Amino acid sequence: MLEPPAAVVAYLDAQRRGSPPDRACTKAAVKAVLAELERRAPGRSVELRVPPYAAIQLIAGTAHRRGTPPALVQLAAPDLIDLAVGSLLWADGLADGRVRASGERSDLSGYLPLFDPAVQFPS
C-alpha cells in the first residue's frame, strides 16, 4: 500500500488536531484520492461523485457518455477520504448510508483502501 499523498496527510492532520479541514484542503485531498483511484481503475463505466468537489469515471466496461450513468457511486468528501485510508469499510459505508452505490460494477471495495492507514504525523 502507498503512503498517502501530502494533501491527504494535511487533511487527516487537521482532523487529528480537532480543527475541521478548510475547503481548499478538503478539495486537494479529494482530488488526490480520485487521481489514485483513476490510476488503479481506469475506465468509464462507473461515475464516482464527491459533491461539490469532483466527479470521475473509472473501471473498464461499458463507457458512459451522457445522461444518467449505468453505475453510480456518490459520497461526501470525508467518507471518501476515510475509505481511502481504511478508517471506513465499504460495507459499513453502504450499510449506514454514507456511501450510495447503484448499478453494475459500482462495488469499489476491491480498490479500497488506497493508502497505508499508519500515517505518521509530525510532532
Residue spans of the language-model regions?
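Feature captures hydrophobic
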Residues: 1-123
